């Protein structure tokens, strides 16, 4: 079963999977800033719908197992917080959905620290990298190998193009999982507008050389030919303008 690209008409399906996968995520709890579970789920749903749609516009959204798992990617030189993406995706509406503290956490703390840290860690490679923004599998579908199918197609592209992959992990127990796939811990950052700091672990996967890839016995995940061609076009287009990020 190969991963498939998510189209705009299915953005709500993709968002629902991520809401289920990240329902107890400490960063999501921190950003939504509410103790009402019904309100929390509503805010999470709206937040992920905006974020998924922004990635459909500017990046790449993959699903596997009939939306059992979802991964959100930004290719070289792209991001979701330019004005075009904010307006088209509806992300601006979060300013009116979150309370005053939630707005400060999301727009004044969360987005800036993510952008600044990524630029600081990757340096001149910031516009020459892939960004794994979110990857999640529905709680009822875990343990079926969906994670590998959601990330390895981009691994293969990055190995061919010599590009690193960057991510932030919001759960400490995820580090060994990502390390299994070749990511290396770099540093931790913290969201600090609460009594207890919320950590995020920065990790990078460097591209494998051809000889190392040939020696690897792990099976390679695949996409359909149509989707693979589409991703290849995105990579080529991003690299062509990688020195000038889309904004």
UniProtKB/Swiss-Prot annotation:
Asked if Disulfide bond is a keyword of the record, the answer is no
Q: What is its main location?
A: endoplasmic reticulum
SUPFAM superfamilies cross-referenced by the UniProt entry? Acyl-CoA N-acyltransferases (Nat) (SSF55729)
Listed transmembrane segments: none
Looking at the record's lineage, which domain of life comes first? Answer: Eukaryota
**Where in or outside the cell?**
Endoplasmic reticulum; Golgi apparatus; Vacuole
Query: Residue limits of the N-acetyltransferase domain?
Result: 70-205
Record-level GO cellular component terms? endoplasmic reticulum; fungal-type vacuole membrane; Golgi apparatus
Keywords recorded for this protein, A-Z: Acyltransferase, Endoplasmic reticulum, Golgi apparatus, Transferase, Vacuole
For this UniProt entry, the molecular function terms from Gene Ontology, in alphabetical order, are: N-acetyltransferase activity
Known EC number(s)?
2.3.1.-
Which class of enzymes does this protein belong to? transferase
Family in the record:
Belongs to the acetyltransferase family.
The protein's name: Uncharacterized N-acetyltransferase C550.08
Species name: Schizosaccharomyces pombe (strain 972 / ATCC 24843) (Fission yeast)
């Amino acid at each position: 079963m190969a991963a498939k690209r998510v189209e705009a008409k299915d953005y709500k399906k993709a968002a629902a999977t991520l809401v289920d996968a990240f329902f107890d995520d400490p960063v999501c709890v921190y950003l939504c800033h509410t103790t009402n579970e019904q309100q929390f789920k509503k805010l999470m749903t709206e937040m992920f719908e905006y974020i998924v749609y922004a990635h459909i516009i500017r990046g790449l959204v993959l699903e596997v197992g009939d939306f059992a798992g979802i991964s959100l990617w930004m290719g070289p030189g792209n991001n979701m917080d330019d004005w075009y993406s904010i307006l088209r995706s509806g992300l601006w509406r979060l300013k009116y959905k979150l309370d005053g503290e939630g707005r400060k956490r999301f727009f004044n703390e969360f987005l800036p620290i993510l952008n600044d840290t990524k630029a600081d860690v990757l340096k001149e490679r910031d516009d020459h990298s892939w960004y794994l923004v979110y990857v999640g599998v529905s709680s009822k579908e875990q343990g079926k190998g969906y994670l590998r199918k959601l990330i390895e197609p981009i691994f293969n592209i990055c190995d061919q193009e010599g590009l690193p992959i960057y991510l932030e992990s919001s759960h400490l127990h995820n580090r060994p999982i990502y390390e299994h796939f070749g990511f290396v811990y770099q540093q931790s950052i913290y969201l600090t507008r609460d009594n207890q700091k919320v950590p995020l672990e920065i990790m990078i996967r460097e591209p494998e050389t051809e000889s190392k890839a040939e020696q690897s016995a792990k099976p390679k995940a695949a996409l359909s030919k149509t989707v693979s061609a589409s991703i290849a076009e995105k990579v080529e287009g991003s690299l062509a303008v990688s020195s000038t990020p889309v904004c």
